[in-house]
């Protein structure tokens, strides 16, 4: 039986997790909570999406929530996660996608309402992080609060794993060329902690920080301290790309790297890591469900130990599909 899921926070990721849950069919969303959205407005936001198009199905409202494809889904407007009656709705696995409750202590408030597990759809300072295809098999059923890491870590980690497993990584630097997100500004505005981040998203390339590369060391312990990186926020609305430059332990040709990535993409990382030799651009991957799509033509080797690798990701859709996959996976472990 599909695990019953509740979603807290019906913003970009919350809504796209919802769409992916329906598309994948492996989890059953039974309830949603968002204190800032009324039910009829939630229906509108779910139906129409500027990036991913109209919802393919039917959406109606009733006095207690939404009716999606004929199925009732309770909608709550609680500000405090502890007050959301997940237990009454039968929701066991909660997607914490507000971006606010990202620590174990804050996210565990959901357990008070009857939930069994909480998956944070963001990096966490203290909750264990899992990346599907990389370290999900280290999950133990006594873990109650966990993180699906970030979209960028989900792109970088599978690629880094393949390179490290086959050729060894001495050290590496990553740049993610990242589409703008909701935290950025439409026009110049105040941003006290990040002055550059307060500048207009649609007309600037904005250097920014990211913890995504360092986080790889948490999901692949042998790479701890060997990777770091930064971001360039660019004027595109979705789909980002990781540029990973690594020094390898073993001498390697670029063709050998391509072969290793292609093999992994067709076997143990199928559906998570992709491989393409097509001349693609970012919009070609809008709506792609994979975490990381290796661009064989875009990378380059300086010598046999120093290589630049390029991998794309739909930072909304692909990441949200992994949230669904992680819940599907841990529910099977929990049932054993």
Curated annotation (Swiss-Prot):
* PROSITE patterns recorded: GAPDH
Q: Which Pfam families match?
A: Gp_dh_C (PF02800), Gp_dh_N (PF00044)
Record-annotated residues binding D-glyceraldehyde 3-phosphate? 150-152, 181, 210-211, 233
Please name the pathway: Carbohydrate degradation; glycolysis; pyruvate from D-glyceraldehyde 3-phosphate: step 1/5
> What are the UniProt keywords, alphabetically?
Cytoplasm, Glycolysis, NAD, Oxidoreductase, Stress response
The record's annotation in Gene3D superfamilies points to: Dihydrodipicolinate Reductase, domain 2, NAD(P)-binding Rossmann-like Domain
Q: Which InterPro entries match?
A: GlycerAld/Erythrose_P_DH, GlycerAld_3-P_DH_AS, GlycerAld_3-P_DH_cat, GlycerAld_3-P_DH_NAD(P)-bd, Glyceraldehyde-3-P_DH_1, NAD(P)-bd_dom_sf
Record's subcellular location: Cytoplasm
Task: Specify the inducers.
Answer: Up-regulated when grown with elevated levels of potassium chloride.
Q: Where is the signal peptide?
A: none
Acyltransferase as UniProt keyword: no
- Extract the GO molecular function terms from the UniProt entry: glyceraldehyde-3-phosphate dehydrogenase (NAD+) (phosphorylating) activity; NAD binding; NADP binding
Would you kindly state one Gene Ontology biological process term found in this protein's UniProt entry? gluconeogenesis
Q: Which reaction does it catalyse?
A: D-glyceraldehyde 3-phosphate + phosphate + NAD(+) = (2R)-3-phospho-glyceroyl phosphate + NADH + H(+)
This enzyme's EC code(s): 1.2.1.12
The name of this protein is Glyceraldehyde-3-phosphate dehydrogenase
| Organism annotation | Emericella nidulans (strain FGSC A4 / ATCC 38163 / CBS 112.46 / NRRL 194 / M139) (Aspergillus nidulans)
- List the lineage, top down: Eukaryota, Fungi, Dikarya, Ascomycota, Pezizomycotina
């Amino acid at each position: 039986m599909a695990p019953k899921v509740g979603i807290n926070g019906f913003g970009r990721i919350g809504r796209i997790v919802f769409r992916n849950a329906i598309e994948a069919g492996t989890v059953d969303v039974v309830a949603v909570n968002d204190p800032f959205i009324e039910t009829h407005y939630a229906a509108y936001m779910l139906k129409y999406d500027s990036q991913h198009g109209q919802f393919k199905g039917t959406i109606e409202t009733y006095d207690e929530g939404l009716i999606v494809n004929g199925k009732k889904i309770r909608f709550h407007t609680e500000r405090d996660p502890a007050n959301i009656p997940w237990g009454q709705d039968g929701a066991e696995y909660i997607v914490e996608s507000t971006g606010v409750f990202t620590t174990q202590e804050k996210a565990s408030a959901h357990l008070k309402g009857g939930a069994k597990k909480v998956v944070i759809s963001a990096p966490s300072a203290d909750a264990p992080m899992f990346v599907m295809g990389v370290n999900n098999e280290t999950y133990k059923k006594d873990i109650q609060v966990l993180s699906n890491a970030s979209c960028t870590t989900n792109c970088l980690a599978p690629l880094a794993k393949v390179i490290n497993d086959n050729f060894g990584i001495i050290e590496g630097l990553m740049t993610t060329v990242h589409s703008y997100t909701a935290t950025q500004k439409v026009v110049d505005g105040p941003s006290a902690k990040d002055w550059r981040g307060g500048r207009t998203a649609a007309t600037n390339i904005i250097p920014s920080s990211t913890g995504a590369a360092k986080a790889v060391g948490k999901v692949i312990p042998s790479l701890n301290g060997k990777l770091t990186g930064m971001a360039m926020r660019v004027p595109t609305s979705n789909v980002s790309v990781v540029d990973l430059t690594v020094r390898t332990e073993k001498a390697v040709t670029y063709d050998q790297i391509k072969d290793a990535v292609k093999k992994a993409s067709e076997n143990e990382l199928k559906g998570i890591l992709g491989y393409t030799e097509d001349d693609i651009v970012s919009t070609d991957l809008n709506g792609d469900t994979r975490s990381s799509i290796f661009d064989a033509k875009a990378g380059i080797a300086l010598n046999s130990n120093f290589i630049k690798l390029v991998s794309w990701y739909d930072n909304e859709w692909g990441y949200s599909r992994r949230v669904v996959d992680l819940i599907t996976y841990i529910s099977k472990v929990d049932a054993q």
